[in-house]
């Protein structure tokens, strides 16, 4: 089995070892020989096409090189009894469009299929694959990759900006190319202080409204924005600006458009044989057969492809619950229990462990993140310790609870105080990322600003309060594009964000400035990220003040030299002479206040130092007395 770190191999020979590992489900570089590859055979240059179709009677390659005609010389030959087919076509070349005509051995019916391993495809509504052999790129991110390999992300800052390339910005209503995005995106991410960008899926998909989560071309770069080299340049530029790149990846299911993977050889092939397991009615897709060796090779090799060829730093694995549970989104009677009578998908569990094991072994510094909405245990526990092996898990519970809380009238918040504190009960059970993602600002859920309670002033104040509380809460961070400058309408994938409001309204400009300053605070204060998953890094001062809806807690660095005190007031009431217990005697300085005038607040800031006094409060021997502004978060730091 070949083992390479970057750039596609143009050597087309399919060795016995490749074939063996492919059918055993252990080949992690299948894209090196599957699909269309440049070849020179008996002194003649051309393209070798290889595909897997175990129930095919015949497969013919048609395309620009033969005027889309079925010809005897372009029929593939079976090279194994388990469904590998291949043919060398001399006059095929880079840039030619092509498809496979696959005839089923039982029905004699034929289907026109795109190449599952194609590196590039036509833009919808066209569906042909495109021979792509010119993919070499000279990278300049060696320093980034060296640093990545040595980085422990658990005790380093991670502040992720999630975005959908097609709607971040457009040009005269048209998609920006990767090269056009290269001119503005890296600089914007860097100036705003985010450490990573998370791209929603970049593989080819026919329906814009699916946002990429119903793919057909798993190996094909999204053609809406350009070609392979353009995407590599964009990632390279991001890395050279010290910005990591995370990719949303969809290994659980696939689009059922007829040119894609569905019934690839005229019968279940990439999907499960049993319709109850294969058909995903909720999403209108088909689920991958994760117990089939060749399908596992397809998917794990795909993960390796994005990491090796595009230097992707992490994969956010979509819809993990759909992989883990046989009864996910299914009523009783619509699913078949496993061999032990349970609802766990044993094949899905084994696949996720194998995926994470392979990436840990071969891709130093690359992370995996689970989007998983149930309470499945040990998702971010290493495989060797009995877990699934992910590095992180999105904290969907925190997101649901806190967004519900922040939408309540402050009069009633005291009755639901547990919504804002409960997350710390289970926080250390997983390596959580606090995520406010695209899913929370679509389908009638309202934009983030419109989730906030009250009139316009209170909405803005509530947003600043909430985001400051989020920065202080243990766990890495993620926010969806548009929230940082207060987009009032829900996200729409068919148009660009409302960037014009930043120039038109001072409140939007002030909030954008707030996010930048908040991100600066996060990046500069070790206490906010060094002990996210260590009990030492967080301590409540007062978690029980439900009557006033005030939270207070301490964040600490490993060496205890840096301590930050957060006070979050979730009511529109100013509290004067508020006594707060503190861990150390000395003077404290306000280092952040979400009520600052420059952010659009009322300007109730503390310009002078605050000295502690030897009076017991909240279980501490020292206390300070402060004024807490309305709907605001204060951050204090011990300075001496």
Swiss-Prot record:
One Gene Ontology cellular component: cytosol
Transferase listed as a keyword: yes
Catalytic activity field: Transfers a segment of a (1->4)-alpha-D-glucan chain to a primary hydroxy group in a similar glucan chain
Recorded metabolic or biological pathway in which this protein acts: Glycan biosynthesis; glycogen biosynthesis
Pfam families, per database record: Alpha-amylase (PF00128), Alpha-amylase_C (PF02806), CBM_48 (PF02922)
GO molecular function, one term: cation binding
Catalytic residues in the record: 318, 371
GO biological process assignments: glycogen biosynthetic process
Enzyme Commission number(s) from the entry: 2.4.1.18
Gene3D superfamilies with a match to the protein in the record: Glycosidases, Golgi alpha-mannosidase II, Immunoglobulins
CDD domains reported in the protein's UniProt record: AmyAc_Glg_BE (cd11322), E_set_GBE_prok_N (cd02855)
Top-level taxon: Bacteria
Root EC class: transferase
Keyword annotations: Carbohydrate metabolism, Glycogen biosynthesis, Glycogen metabolism, Glycosyltransferase, Transferase
Keyword NAD: no
InterPro entries associated with the record: A-amylase/branching_C (IPR006048), Branching_enzy (IPR037439), GlgB (IPR006407), GlgB_N_E_set_prok (IPR044143), Glyco_hydro_13_cat_dom (IPR006047), Glyco_hydro_13_N (IPR004193), Glyco_hydro_b (IPR013780), Glycoside_hydrolase_SF (IPR017853)
HAMAP family noted in UniProt: GlgB
Function: Catalyzes the formation of the alpha-1,6-glucosidic linkages in glycogen by scission of a 1,4-alpha-linked oligosaccharide from growing alpha-1,4-glucan chains and the subsequent attachment of the oligosaccharide to the alpha-1,6 position.
Family the entry assigns: Belongs to the glycosyl hydrolase 13 family. GlgB subfamily.
Subunit structure: Monomer.
Descriptive protein name: 1,4-alpha-glucan branching enzyme GlgB
